[in-house]
Swiss-Prot record:
Source organism of the structure: Oryza sativa subsp. japonica
Cofactor: FAD
Matches recorded under CDD domains: FHA_ZEP-like
Record key words, sorted: Abscisic acid biosynthesis, Chloroplast, FAD, Flavoprotein, Membrane, Oxidoreductase, Plastid, Stress response, Thylakoid, Transit peptide
Designated name of the protein: Zeaxanthin epoxidase, chloroplastic
Protein's gene: ZEP
Domain FHA residues, every copy: 553-607
Amino acid sequence: MALLSATAPAKTRFSLFSHEEAQHPHPHALSACCGGGASGKRQRARARVAAAMRPADAAASVAQAASPGGGGEGTRRPRVLVAGGGIGGLVLALAARRKGYEVTVFERDMSAVRGEGQYRGPIQIQSNALAALEAIDMSVAEEVMREGCVTGDRINGLVDGISGSWYIKFDTFTPAAERGLPVTRVISRMTLQQILARAVGDDAILNDSHVVDFIDDGNKVTAILEDGRKFEGDLLVGADGIWSKVRKVLFGQSEATYSEYTCYTGIADFVPPDIDTVGYRVFLGHKQYFVSSDVGAGKMQWYAFHKEPAGGTDPENGKNKRLLEIFNGWCDNVVDLINATDEEAILRRDIYDRPPTFNWGKGRVTLLGDSVHAMQPNLGQGGCMAIEDGYQLAVELEKSWQESAKSGTPMDIVSSLRRYEKERILRVSVIHGLARMAAIMATTYRPYLGVGLGPLSFLTKLRIPHPGRVGGRFFIKYGMPLMLSWVLGGNSTKLEGRPLSCRLSDKANDQLRRWFEDDDALEQAMGGEWYLLPTSSGDSQPIRLIRDEKKSLSIGSRSDPSNSTASLALPLPQISENHATITCKNKAFYVTDNGSEHGTWITDNEGRRYRVPPNFPVRFHPSDAIEFGSDKKAVFRVKVLSTLPYESARGGPQILQAA
C-alpha cells in the first residue's frame, strides 16, 4: 500500500493525451487517502474502465495487480517504482507493463520533459534502439518510426569544417539491413515522450512528483517525494538523469565530469540542396566542431561545440553573433545554418558526462540511463542505451518471475537487478568510451601542419596534410564499419521474440554505394540550384546556372552578340571581350578560359588559388571562388541552394536553360 503524508498537498497528474479523459487522482494516492468503502469501490470501477480501454496485456496487468490477497512476492508480480519519466524511464515502464507488472512513474514535469524537449531538441533513435522498441511493443515502435525522419538511408559522416570536404563517410544502412534491423531515425523528444507516455497509460504516471530519497528495508522499497509523500514498491529504478537523486542516495554525492565544451544548439527552417543524399554531418575543427542533421518537415537541427570553461553566458541577443565569430571562415554548410537560425531559437548548455562505473545498484534499487552512464552526445547513443537498459531490465525481472512461478518460491528481485546490471555494464562502458573518443577526435582534428601551433601557424599556407589527419582517416576507414556493426547490431541477439526482418519502406537509394565511393557522384546527385554570387558590392547580380548541356554562358567585357540570351557583360579593364565560357556536362559545371590576357582564376574550398589553363574546361565546385581577370570586382562565389535567401538573386538574370 502506498503511504501518503497527511500534511502533504495532493498533486494532480498531467496528461499528455490529445483526447479528453476524465481526470482522477493517482490510484496509489487514493488508496492511501480513502482506504476501502464506497470510494474504494468507485476507484476499482474506474480501474476496470481504464483496463478495458488499454491493450489486453496492459489490462491483464491491472487486473492482476488489483486482485485480492496479492501481498506477497510469490503470488503477484512485483510493483515497480520508476523515478523519472524521461525516455529510459518510460521505456522501462512500457516494457514492464506489457509483461504484466504494476508500474508507477514519478516525474517532476511531464510537460517540459525535464527541459530536454527545449534544450536538446530532436533525438536520434538508431537501429539498435528501434529494434529494442520493436521487441517491447511493435505498435509503439511503428508509431515512432512513422513520426521519425529517416537519416540512415543516406550518406552520413565527418567533413572538414573549413573546406566542407568529406573526411570519412559512415554506412549506417548496411549494418542494419544485414541484421534485419530498422534504419536510424531522428524524432522530436516531445513526440517520442508523448508516444511512450500514451502507451504506458496515464494511470501509471504521477506528474509533479520528484523522488528525493528512498528506504530499502530488504523486503520493500519506499520512495520519498520532495513534498513528503511516500510510495511503497518491490523495487525502485532511478531513471532520473545525470543529476540523479536516487544515485546520490545510493552512492553519495559525486560530481559529473565537465567535457570542457559548451554546446549551442538550434533548429532552423532550412533545406540544404543535398537533403536527399546526406542525413547528417560532423564538421571537424581544432577545439571546436559542428554537427548538422535533417530532422524532417523542412528543418535542420545543429549543435555547435566550443572549448571553454563551464558556466559561460552570452549577452542578450548575442548567441548568433558569437557563433558567427567562432565559426568565421568555416564552410557554407555551417555558416548558412547559423545565419538561418533565429536568435531566440539558439540555446546553450555545458556538456557533462559521468565516468563508467561497475556498481549500478544495491539491494532492491538500481539505476538506468543517464543516471548511471550519462555520455557525451557524439555518437547519438545516450538515449539508445537507456532504451536498451529498459528492455533488458524488464527481461531480467520476467525471468526471475517465471523461475519463481515454476518453483513456487518468492521471486528473487535482488538477483534479477544484479543480472540486469551485469548484462549491461560492458556494452554501455564501451560505447561510453567511444563517445569520449569521438569528442577527442572531433576537437583535435588538424587538416594541415601548423594548425594550433601558434608561431608556426604560417605552415598552414603550405597545405601539408597533418600526419594525424592521414592516420586518423586510415583508422576510421577500416575501424568504423566494425564499430558501427557492433554498436547497431551487437545487442540484437538478446532481443526475444523479435523477427529479423527489414521494413520495405527502409530502402536506400540504389546509388548509395556509389556515393560512398565517389564524391563527384554525390555532388552531381545534389538538388538545388547553382548560383554565382558576386563577392563585391558592385552592380553585378547573382547569376543562376541551370543545367543544360546544349547551352553555354559567355563572359566578356561586352555582351556576346552570338549568344545574347546567355551572356554576362563585365565592363572592367581586366576583362577581355571574349574572356571565358561556362558549360554544363553530366550535371557538373566547367569554366573555360578563352585565352584572356589576365586569365581566369579559381580559389577552391581548400584555399588553393590557381589559374585556369587556356582553352581547357576546368570543373568548379560549390564554395569555389571564380575570378575573371584577377579583378576583385569580378569575383563570384559558387553556391548551391534549395531556396535563395536574397531577394535580388531571385530577380537576377537566368543564364542557362534548366535541364
